[in-house]
């Protein structure tokens, strides 16, 4: 092989080797792109999971899904119907909350469309101030969209002093529109259920707050 052929061979070898050196750079770029896409998907999924909680709560309140009751601003304008329905009251306390919680009446009968006030009694059985929030629903779940609360202790957090007992009212009515919903044909009883969950410990008050200073003995 003469010098000219050797030069051509060397040039050809170099040209063939060049793409081989560039390949790793293309691979790294492709991996970085895939990694970036995966990271973006993870971030979007995390964001969606947080957004799903308030959206789910709003959806339940708006539709009565999963037995979530509705919030009414006023009594119905029409007169109550002749049809009557039973309403049962259930009370529960989550673990770790030292409260006694029970309805004054476990069951009543009301006219559909009638505004009714009932009471639950709550006692803080501990020696410290505690706070809790009540979660609620009704069964059967199909009745949630028609159980309208005008006022309820469950709308806000409740703070109870040590040993305090309190009556907590619920003002509600069953929407007459329930009679047009065939899913609730033959419905005779609705159960309203509450469960109190601890929120956090209230800031303890100093034992000697408001008391006059006491003389100290000699050291």
UniProtKB/Swiss-Prot annotation:
Recorded superkingdom: Bacteria
Compositional bias (Low complexity): 14-24
Annotated region described as Disordered, given as residue ranges: 1-24
Keywords: Cell inner membrane, Cell membrane, Copper, Membrane, Signal-anchor, Transmembrane, Transmembrane helix
UniProt keyword Iron, yes or no: no
TM annotation in the entry: 30-52
Periplasmic membrane side: 53-219
Stored Gene3D superfamilies: Ctag/Cox11
Subcellular location: Cell inner membrane
Biased composition range(s): Polar residues: 1-13
One Pfam family, short name: CtaG_Cox11
GO (cellular component) term, any one: plasma membrane
InterPro entries xref list: CtaG/Cox11_dom_sf (IPR023471), Cyt_c_oxidase_assmbl_CtaG (IPR007533)
Topology in the lipid bilayer: Single-pass type II membrane protein
Recorded GO MF terms: copper ion binding
Positions on the Cytoplasmic side per record topology: 1-29
Family: Belongs to the COX11/CtaG family.
Role: Exerts its effect at some terminal stage of cytochrome c oxidase synthesis, probably by being involved in the insertion of the copper B into subunit I.
Protein name: Cytochrome c oxidase assembly protein CtaG
Gene behind this protein: ctaG
């Amino acid at each position: 092989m003469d010098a000219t052929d050797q030069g051509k061979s060397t040039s050809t070898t170099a040209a063939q080797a060049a793409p081989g050196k560039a390949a790793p750079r293309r691979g790294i770029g492709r991996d970085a792109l895939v990694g970036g896409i995966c990271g973006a998907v993870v971030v979007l999924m995390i964001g969606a999971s947080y957004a799903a909680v308030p959206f789910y709560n709003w959806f339940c309140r708006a539709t009565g899904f999963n037995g979530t009751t509705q919030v009414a601003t006023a009594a119905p304008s029409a007169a109550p119907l002749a049809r009557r329905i039973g309403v049962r009251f259930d009370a529960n306390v989550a673990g770790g909350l030292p409260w006694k919680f029970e309805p004054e009446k476990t069951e009543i009968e009301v006219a559909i469309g009638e505004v009714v006030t009932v009471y639950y009694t709550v006692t803080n059985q501990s020696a410290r101030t505690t706070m809790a929030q009540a979660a609620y629903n009704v069964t059967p779940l199909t009745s949630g969209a028609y159980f309208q609360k005008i006022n309820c202790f469950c709308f806000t957090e409740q703070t109870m002093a040590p040993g305090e007992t309190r009556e907590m009212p619920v003002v509600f009515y069953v929407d007459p529109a329930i009679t047009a919903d065939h899913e609730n044909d033959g419905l005779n009883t609705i159960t309203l259920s509450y469960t109190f969950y601890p929120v956090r410990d209230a800031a303890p008050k100093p034992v000697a707050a408001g008391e006059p200073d006491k003389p100290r003995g000699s050291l």
